[in-house]
């Protein structure tokens, strides 16, 4: 689906929402497409979202629901966003905007693309380099505008291995996901371990 949209290697893609499986599907899909995940905190106000979208120069964003869509629509015209993909359509039945699509429809575009471009997905995934930027994690912006920390696949892997060396997990461990996926620590303990 990301390749069908036209995501280029190392292109930034914004993700906005509470922790849920779709966040992870998008996050890992973006990385497999050699893109860069730019998480946005679900508590962000429209002006903060606008700043992050413009700073990241994202053309594509995924978001959770009507609440987040309302915030994005308030600033969408002031960003480079071409397509907004909504995971949860509840409350949006009958909603129509050419810039907005729903997650299921977006995935169907990917199925069609994979059928007409055999091997393209695997080729892109295999082209990922350790020094490629995997994520941009934005600071909270308490001392000014948020700053984007660019994290490579290699640095994430090294940090995850270092954490596991001092706190090895077991197969029967259960993890409570309490920080937003836009936060690096939640990724390190919930996603990458």
Model-predicted regions and their roles:
Residues 1-47:
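Conserved AMP-binding/adenylate-forming
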Residues 29-35, 186-193:
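Conserved short alpha-helical elements in the N-terminal third of ANL/AMP-binding
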Residues 34, 141-142:
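Conserved G/P- and acidic residue-centered "switch" motifs that form tight phosphate/ATP-binding loops
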Residues 59, 77-87, 175-176:
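Conserved helix-loop-beta element of the AMP-binding
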Residues 66-81:
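Adenylate-forming
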Residues 101-104, 111-138, 145, 168-174:
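Conserved pre-ATP/AMP-binding loop-to-beta segment of ANL
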Residues 130, 149-170, 175-178, 188:
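Conserved structural elements of the adenylate-forming
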């Amino acid at each position: 689906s990301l390749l069908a949209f036209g995501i280029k290697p190392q292109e930034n893609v914004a993700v906005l929402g509470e922790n849920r499986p779709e966040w992870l599907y998008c996050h890992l899909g973006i990385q497999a497409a050699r893109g860069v995940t730019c998480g946005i905190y679900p508590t962000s106000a429209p002006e903060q979202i606008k700043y992050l979208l413009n700073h990241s120069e994202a053309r594509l964003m995924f978001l959770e629901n009507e609440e987040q869509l309302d915030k994005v629509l308030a600033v969408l015209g002031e960003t480079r966003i071409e397509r907004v993909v909504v995971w949860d359509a509840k409350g949006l039945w009958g909603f129509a905007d050419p810039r907005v699509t729903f997650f299921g429809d977006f995935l169907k575009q990917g199925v069609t693309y994979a059928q007409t471009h055999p091997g393209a997905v695997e080729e892109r995934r295999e082209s990922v380099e350790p020094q490629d930027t995997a994520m941009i994690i934005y600071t909270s912006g308490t001392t000014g505008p948020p700053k984007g920390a660019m994290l490579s696949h290699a640095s994430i892997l090294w940090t995850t291995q270092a954490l596991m060396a001092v706190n090895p997990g077991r197969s029967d461990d259960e993890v409570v996901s309490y920080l937003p996926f836009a936060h690096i620590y939640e990724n390190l303990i919930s996603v990458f371990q």
